[in-house]
Amino acid sequence: MGIDADAETVQGATRYLPHVVQADATDVDTMRELGASDFETAVVAIGTDIEASILATYILVDLKIPRIWAKAITGSHGSILERVGAHRVVFPERDMGIRVAHTLTGRTIDYLELDPHFALVETTVPKEVAGKTLATAEIRSKYGLTVVCVKQGNGPFTYTTPDTMLREGDVLVVAGEPRRAEEFASLE
């Protein structure tokens, strides 16, 4: 179920959700009447109204929703949402900004940092390893990275083996320490 105070937003959400209601998510009685406590998961995606976001999250915690995700727009906002009881706080604008910034240099196509010490990076094969098999390229020993999969030409991503031939233009997904993955993606 989706809940929003804005009629236009509610109308647009009907394409994605089976049941959408125009209501005030910051009113505990309304949330009870709508049966919010019957749901296993709630997502608070209130945009710029920090007070409404915190209040809606608090109400869902009070209704004992087992899993609550909440969107934060600042670090302080995120800290408050955690203290109020959100189980997971996400920063979509910040995270997407970081992700896009990583694709602006080198050969990085996509970047996903899972924590400060581990990232998945989609990148093209550098000239230094093109024409070699995964075993002879020694990416793990030289760069400390694991090659998760490869996409050759217009084909799908496939798991690699030591015999996988790395060709210029192929796309790799590598996993490892972010700094090392960025260095690998910056090779010529």
Feature map (PLM): residue ranges:
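Cytosolic regulatory regions of ion transport systems
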Residues: 1-188
